[in-house]
Amino acid sequence: MDEIINKYQAVEKLFKEIQEGLAAYDQYKTLISELLHYNNHIKQEYFNFLMIISPYLIRAHSGETLRNKVNNEIKRLILVENINTKISKTLVSVNFLLQKKLSVDGVKTKNMWCTNNPMLQVKTAHNLFKQLCDTQSKTQWVQTLKYKECKYCHTDMVFNTTQFGLQCPNCGCIQELMGTIFDETHFYNHDGQKAKSGIFNPNRHYRFWIEHILGRNSEQELGTKQDPCGTKVLQQLKKIIKRDNKCIALLTVENIRKMLKEINRTDLNNCVSLILRKLTGVGPPQISESILLRGEYIFTEAIKIREKVCKKGRINRNYYPYYIYKIFDAILPPNDTTNRRILQYIHLQGNDTLANNDSEWESICMELPEIKWKPTDRTHCVHFF
């Protein structure tokens, strides 16, 4: 119990130190607000923990005969509540935020995803925080120019495309933006087409596909207005399985995709993992949060590199499950057969497309030190039976 309390106190001290150390810098406001979210979360968990154990502490001091019973009860609570996992999960997220901020500032850091020890994770976070402070101390001479603020009434100015600059909504002052070209296509729709945002977020695509590959998406995605729960689809698939004498335990992603094509429901190809779980009772492996975060970090870097090395003449369209397949094939050890089952739930495209993707992936790996390139092995499924 004392060990758990010490861990909570170490985490609280870490958050306080980071907040006080970075509060003076505007560029860290977003980072601090995200860290405060985790700080409030860990405080609530700590409060709940103390509320649970306090009655047992009172009983422990009431007599020697009750102490062993009380200690056993506290140990049971710690196991049931899974306190260590909650602390560790929070610290993994915090370390990811700090490491991501350092990478934005151009500072290279080592991957620190392997440990599940909360005290080591606190030490890691403290080291990352010190690197942030060192980076800031080297760039203190750099000043931030608040060019959007009106110099007369100090309110935020807005873009005025007709005047090619910023205009204050209060006093009407116009500030010309030197060296800036305004393209009307960024501000208006043409031919009834919807204007697209210029911000591309690889993390959104990663989370969408991970959710579907691991079968965590909503079961309502299988349904229609006439069949909200997707019962009809599952019944149709079961009829085909019975007709073809298929073994349910050996069903694969490709089997499900072929059956969906037969019943004209290829719109459910993204839900194959969920369908497999509903039919077989066995779902994809539950990958730990630290591995998923590491995969997200590498995925984001890979997409950025891909935009630079993309071959001319190829359609600018990514098949994101391929990237996820290659990343997890590389970061999961060969003997980790449990987690490597995730590869079974990722559909790979045809041989020609796969060869082109492998060639492109080789170029990406040359600039991605976390991944060592190797050709895609379609026979991965045989390694898990």
Curated annotation (Swiss-Prot):
Keywords: Late protein, Metal-binding, Zinc, Zinc-finger
Short name of one Pfam family: Pox_VLTF3
Residue spans, zinc finger C2H2-type: 166-190, 168-190
Induction, per UniProt: Expressed in the late phase of the viral replicative cycle.
Superkingdom of the source species: Viruses
GO BP: any one term: regulation of viral transcription
Keyword Zinc in annotation: yes
Family matches, as InterPro entries: Poxvirus_VLTF3, VLTF-3_Zn_ribbon
GO terms assigned for molecular function: zinc ion binding
Family of the protein in this entry: Belongs to the asfivirus B385R family.
Name of this protein: Zinc finger protein B385R
